[in-house]
Amino acid sequence: MANKKTLNEDGVELTKADLRERFDKYNELYFECKLCGCKFFWLSSNHCAYGKYIAQPTKKGLISKIGVARNTIWIEENLRELLVHEMIHMYKRIIEGKAYDGVLGNGRRFRAHCKRLRDRFGLNIRIHGDFGFINKKLYPKTWEKVLLWLIDR
């Protein structure tokens, strides 16, 4: 089985070290270096999101993890938007201590941070960005399976 790679717009492999470098840069620019201790992982091609923030509880506290879609060719501005989006979730959870903020965590507090970044830095962070999946595996939804089963009877 070939090793799957996540590529940037130039066709160069994107690594977790690249994500860490950008995280550190955006943390300094947009979050006053308040975020730390984040791990990175690649989302499965079966996953339906481009990014995911997880706050994993441990005996020593919360461990933050940011997942990035593997089946996307990342141009720099889209990768920045995705990482900052997930960093907002991290900020709300770790710094503000808020585990819940509306549906999928993109509620009032999330939108307030998006507005702050737009007003102060001209940065547009979308709640549901579309960065273009490649080789997306499409699986039938449950109702489609039931319908097909009924038709075959």
Positions of PLM-derived features:
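Active-site recognition of the HExxH zinc-binding catalytic motif
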Residues: E81-I94
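Metalloprotease/metallohydrolase-associated module, dominated by Zn2+-dependent proteases
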Residues: A2-E77, I94-R153
